[in-house]
């Protein structure tokens, strides 16, 4: 590992990230990336936002900040998945959504719904996620770009600033 280094070029990460997995294994990469991120975050078992923020910084995933705690809004600058990409009319950060959902669910011991409201893919210069805690632990997970979370966030929540 010392000879190879710890860093992977962002273009290699994005090639893997945006591959058409449905063509090869019959699964949408959006949901797969969401669950990869969620599982990774749950296994890392961050105890607080500082640990999460330090991990993002150390592994060069982006710069993360808590915008508000009620409702929970988390912003990522220099996001590894989308920073610098053109406006494609949709959010792109499924891995990050899952990663944040795993963190939130560990800390609060509740399921959550998460929506990416800002993204380079939507024409913004940062990513922002809004989280809603769900009291019922048996409720379905939901990342709003893959469904409407039963209307939990209302309509047209993705926007440009």
UniProtKB/Swiss-Prot annotation:
Similarity field = Belongs to the M.jannaschii MJ0150/MJ0739/MJ0745/MJ1460/MJ1642 family.
Please identify the protein, giving its name as recorded.
Uncharacterized protein MJ1642
Q: Which domain of life is it from?
A: Archaea
Q: Which PANTHER family match?
A: ARSR FAMILY TRANSCRIPTIONAL REGULATOR (PTHR35090:SF2), DNA-DIRECTED RNA POLYMERASE SUBUNIT I (PTHR35090)
Instruction: List, alphabetically, the Pfam families matched.
Output: DUF2507, V4R
Gene3D superfamilies of this UniProt entry? Trafficking protein particle complex subunit 3
């Amino acid at each position: 590992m010392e000879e190879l280094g710890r860093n992977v070029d962002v273009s290699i990460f994005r090639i893997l990230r945006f591959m058409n997995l449905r063509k090869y294994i019959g699964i949408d990469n959006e949901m797969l990336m969401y669950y990869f991120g969620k599982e990774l975050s749950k296994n890392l078992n961050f105890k607080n936002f500082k640990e999460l923020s330090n991990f993002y910084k150390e592994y060069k995933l982006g710069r993360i900040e808590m915008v508000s705690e009620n409702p929970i809004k988390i912003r990522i600058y220099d996001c590894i998945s989308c920073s610098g990409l053109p406006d494609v009319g949709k959010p792109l950060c499924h891995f990050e959504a899952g990663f944040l959902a795993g963190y939130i669910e560990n800390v609060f011991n509740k399921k959550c719904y998460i929506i990416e409201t800002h993204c380079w893919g939507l024409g913004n210069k940062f990513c922002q996620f809004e989280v809603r805690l769900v009291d019922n632990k048996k409720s379905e997970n939901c990342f709003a770009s893959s469904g409407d979370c039963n209307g939990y966030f209302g309509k047209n929540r993705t926007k440009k600033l």
